[in-house]
Amino acid sequence: MNLRLTVLSGGTGTPKLLRGLRELEADFSVIVNTGEDDEILGLYVSPDVDTVLYTLAGIVNDETWYGIKDDGFRGHEFLERLGVDEPLRIGDADRALKQYRTYLMREKGLKLSEAVDEIRRRLGIKWKVYPMTDDRVTTIVETDEGDLHFREFWVERGGKPPVRGVRYEGAEEASPPPDAVDELLRADVVLIGPSNPVTSIGPILSISEIRHIVREKPVVMVSPFIGREPVSGPAGKLMRAVGFEPSVRGLVEYYREWGVEPDVLIMDERDDVELPEGLEVVRTDTLMRDEKDSVRLAREVLRIVEELVG
């Protein structure tokens, strides 16, 4: 049976899983977080969208999960020579893509989703990729040092400031791209990938139309936690800041606050955290160290999806 899968993704954990789905030629689309989008030296930067695009094009830097593999940094280095403090280290090919997207949006009048689709086609990607919204929604980390854009908090401050809370500015007025809505409505299953719940998936669910559709769909969820620690990134600190334990139990409780309940929860086989009752749980090795691991986990996800609705 040819089942349609829509994946909710941020920029690190879930792209590793997308790599496996890509290798298996699965039928899926992706809705991507844009809460970290920013403008840097005149460029429109959409880090999570770009990582997903690079992953599906087979050119992602899979050591950092940001940017393009084997990219150079002569542009960044020359900016340093000019005395320009570029807050994000952008590679040369990566910069070219960002420049092209900025041109499409500013000069050609394309919406973000239209620009992303144009780039997707030019990169030869057959899977549809949608930003969660064409409107500006910004993830703000509320800290003891003031309100910080997520880039400021994580890249510039190293995630060190004590966190009081997280909010998604502009989410109440934002709407998803119509094509993303259509894709989500056609999906047989929604897969919530192992991205940071608070700053990757939370912004997507903060868009009310997306949230309401996801609530009505079968949901498979992959935990980004092993024990009480995330596999990578600041998810633990941010989960605690918004009132949840950084564990698979806290993950379920966090998504329940959004009204989203997993039909199947995939968690790591080494994880012994006690879970809420009534959950259908599959335990497997969720750690994706390389492409082989990504394919293995993706194959398991597809098996679960087929059992759920096939």
Curated annotation (Swiss-Prot):
7,8-didemethyl-8-hydroxy-5-deazariboflavin binds at residues 50, 89. Its EC number is 2.7.8.28. It catalyses: (2S)-lactyl-2-diphospho-5'-guanosine + 7,8-didemethyl-8-hydroxy-5-deazariboflavin = oxidized coenzyme F420-0 + GMP + H(+). It comes from the Archaea. Keywords: Magnesium, Transferase. The keyword Magnesium applies. SUPFAM superfamilies: CofD-like (SSF142338). One of its GO terms (biological process) is F420-0 metabolic process. Pathway: Cofactor biosynthesis; coenzyme F420 biosynthesis. GO terms for molecular function: LPPG:FO 2-phospho-L-lactate transferase activity; magnesium ion binding. Its cofactor is Mg(2+). Belongs to the CofD family. Catalyzes the transfer of the 2-phospholactate moiety from (2S)-lactyl-2-diphospho-5'-guanosine to 7,8-didemethyl-8-hydroxy-5-deazariboflavin (FO) with the formation of oxidized coenzyme F420-0 and GMP. Homodimer. HAMAP family: CofD. This is 2-phospho-L-lactate transferase. It comes from Methanopyrus kandleri (strain AV19 / DSM 6324 / JCM 9639 / NBRC 100938). The gene is cofD.
